[in-house]
Amino acid sequence: MTLPLDLLDMPFARLGDRLGNPLRLLMVHAHPDDETTTTGATAALYAAETIDVYLVTCTRGERGEILDPEAQRVVDDAADGEQALGELRVRELAGAVTMLGIKGSRFLGGAGRWWDSGMAGEESNTDPRSLVAGDFQEQVDALAAAIREIRPQVLVTYDSRGGYGHPDHIRAHQLSLAAVDRAAETGGESESGGEGGGEGAEAWSVAKVYAAVVPFSILRSVARRLGSNGDSPFAPLAEALANGVPEDLIEIPYGVPDHLVTAQIDARDWLDAKTAAMRSHRSQMAADSWFFKLAASSDGGFGIEHFQLLRGTAGPLDDGFEADLFAGVRAVDDSDCEPDFGWLPEEEPAGGELF
């Protein structure tokens, strides 16, 4: 069997960590579509590199905004509209996961265990089924069990503000950090009374935890591009910038200051995969919306995704940023990790081309 030249040029060190474990990335998101809009290009990049990418979604997004007329009709005709929307979004997520090459996807505690809490201040925040009203330790134990099973070196979630302040995003941040700590503990029962790491699961220490973030400079760029007209939430920012208000005097309620960004993943070659996954989330993504058009454009910046290191040690930097979430974790030379070509086909396809 003849290996393609680009594979032969790939250093064996990219196949595992320094202990010989296969590289694995776990993303913890709040609702279906979050995995795509915030980390889709990065997920597709690592999946294409044959790194195992896993996803835990905390809710089915039962209370998300509906932007597709057909989806709205389905919900309106259902006896329980929120339940119907949740079931629809489960199917949409399955399509997006396929487009991004994600190896394993699950819902925290199982689909429907915890519900979308709605936006901050809404009555649904106190619904006993909602994520933010649920038992925190039970949620931590469920995620810790997933961490011990998957054994990722890198976990990606949100920052302490949840990106834009959604209660479920903030909760996902909180329980992710707590679950990382819980998963690293050896033995004992969980604080919620069960087996915290899954029956028979060994403790696992996640090497690096990141928050997916959007720097203020990107938000300003998007605002200037979209202008103050239309339905974009950036209209007030665009108007302030157009009126000459100094940037440091404009309060931006979402995103992070640029100096907090520690990693920048250039995944523009996988923007098509991200866009395809966005199309799968039809109920949430109107194809004629400003957001979809901007995300799908090659110069919209959505193929470069940004992260803030919350736990762990940064690896080597490239122009001031980590260019790889596994920097400092990957095996450093051929002797650290034996290559495994078991995923390659035994026979070459007709024509002599492997792919």
Curated annotation (Swiss-Prot):
Catalytic activity as recorded in UniProt: 1D-myo-inositol 2-acetamido-2-deoxy-alpha-D-glucopyranoside + H2O = 1D-myo-inositol 2-amino-2-deoxy-alpha-D-glucopyranoside + acetate
Cofactor, free-text remark: Binds 1 zinc ion per subunit.
Taxonomic superkingdom: Bacteria
Keywords: Hydrolase, Metal-binding, Zinc
Needed co-factor(s): Zn(2+)
Keyword Calcium tagged: no
A GO term for molecular function: zinc ion binding
SUPFAM superfamilies named among the record's database cross-references: LmbE-like
Biological process, per Gene Ontology: mycothiol biosynthetic process
EC number(s) per entry: 3.5.1.103
Short name of one Pfam family: PIG-L
Residues engaged in binding Zn(2+): H31, D34, H169
The family this protein is said to belong to: Belongs to the MshB deacetylase family.
Physiological role: Catalyzes the deacetylation of 1D-myo-inositol 2-acetamido-2-deoxy-alpha-D-glucopyranoside (GlcNAc-Ins) in the mycothiol biosynthesis pathway.
NCBIfam families associated with the record: mycothiol_MshB
Protein's UniProt name: 1D-myo-inositol 2-acetamido-2-deoxy-alpha-D-glucopyranoside deacetylase 3
Protein species of origin: Catenulispora acidiphila (strain DSM 44928 / JCM 14897 / NBRC 102108 / NRRL B-24433 / ID139908)
Source organism phylogeny: Bacteria, Bacillati, Actinomycetota, Actinomycetes, Catenulisporales
